[in-house]
Amino acid sequence: MLKKSDFHYDLPEELIAQGPLPERSASRLMLVPSAPEQFQDCYVRDLPELLQPGDLLVFNDTRVIPARLFGRKVSGGRVEVLIERFLGTHQAVVQLRTSRSLKVGNRILLDAGGHAEVLGRDGEFYLLSFDVESPLEQWLSDVGQLPLPPYIHREPDEYDRERYQTVFARAVGAVAAPTAGLHFDESLLARLRARGVEFGYITLHVGAGTFQPVRVALLQEHVMHSEWFKVGAELVEQVRSARARGGRVIAVGTTVVRSLESAMRHGELQPFVGETQIFIFPGYCIRSVDAMVTNFHLPESTLLMLVAAFAGRTRILDAYYHAVQQRYRFFSYGDAMLLFPRNAGEQ
C-alpha cells in the first residue's frame, strides 16, 4: 500500500516563489517526456515549438474571488473568515480561524462593515449568513482580500489581484488560482493559435481544501475535499474532434485532469455539472489527457500524487530532484512542467 511518505522530497525554503516574475511566460518549463528520454530545461514561451498543430489545450476558466475577511467576536476575539463557496446572495460556506470555535447563533462583527451569523457547522466548515450592504459576491469584490496560499509569507497587494488570476478567468467562484494557467499571457496564446493549437475550457472552482495536507499515513484512508466543476458539451465535442484528427488533449493544470476524469462515463468524456471528490494517485489510470502542463507541488500533497499517477512516481521524484538541483521556482507563483505519461508497467 502506498504511504504519504512515499511522496516526500526535500525542498530548500528559498526555492518557494514568493511572487510572480515580471512576465508570465518567462517562467521556466521542464519537459518531462516518457522514459527513458532525458528531461529538458525550457521556458513556458517555448510551448508553441513543443506542441503540434491540431493539439487541444484545455484550461480552467475559474476566477478567484477576494475571499478573505477579518472581524471579531462579540466577546472581542479576532476572527479570520475564508469563503469556500456561495450559497445564494447572502450565505456562504466558510472556514474560520479563531482562538475558540464558534457556535450556532454566534455573530462575527466584520471589519469592513456589517456582520455574519453562524447558522451551522460541518467539520471544519461553517455556514454563515451575512448582513452586508450588497449581495455577498459583489460586496467581497469591493472589500475582500485575496487569499494567497499559506506558503507565501507576505500580505497580498494590488499586483496580486492581477497576477494571481489567469488572463482567461471568467467564472467567479475559486478561492485559489488554477496555477498552471497563470503562465499564459495574450502573446503566448496568440503564438499558440498561429501554431494551430486549439483551446478549450472547463470550470472547476478551486476550494481552500486544495491546501489541506493529507493527515493519514495510508493513501487509501484519505478523504478528498469536494469541488464544483463543469465540463460542457462544447468541450466534449472539441475533445472528440481533436482525437479524430490525431491531435493530443493537453490539460493545463491538475484541476483540468480532475474535471475530465470525473466526467468520464464508460470510457467516454460526457458533459457534466456537479461535485467531484475524485482522488487520483498511482494505481489510477488517467485516460482523458495525453499530456499536462502543471506547476511544482508540495511534498506529500494530493496534487503531487496526481501527477505521479500520470507520469510515474519514480519519474516525478527524479524530475523534482532535477528541479531542485537546477534551482527551479516552486508552487503557485513558480515554474512549470510539461509532462507526458508513464510507460506501461512503470512505477
Curated annotation (Swiss-Prot):
Gene3D superfamilies: QueA-like. The keyword GTP-binding does not apply. It is found in: Cytoplasm. Keywords: Cytoplasm, Queuosine biosynthesis, S-adenosyl-L-methionine, Transferase. GO terms for biological process: queuosine biosynthetic process; tRNA wobble guanine modification. Pathway: tRNA modification; tRNA-queuosine biosynthesis. It catalyses: 7-aminomethyl-7-carbaguanosine(34) in tRNA + S-adenosyl-L-methionine = epoxyqueuosine(34) in tRNA + adenine + L-methionine + 2 H(+). Its EC number is 2.4.99.17. InterPro entries: QueA, QueA_dom1, QueA_dom2, QueA_sf. GO terms for molecular function: S-adenosylmethionine:tRNA ribosyltransferase-isomerase activity. Pfam families: Queuosine_synth. GO terms for cellular component: cytoplasm. The keyword Cytoplasm applies. Its main location: cytoplasm. It is an enzyme of class 2 (transferase). Transfers and isomerizes the ribose moiety from AdoMet to the 7-aminomethyl group of 7-deazaguanine (preQ1-tRNA) to give epoxyqueuosine (oQ-tRNA). Belongs to the QueA family. Monomer. This is S-adenosylmethionine:tRNA ribosyltransferase-isomerase. It comes from Xylella fastidiosa (strain M12).
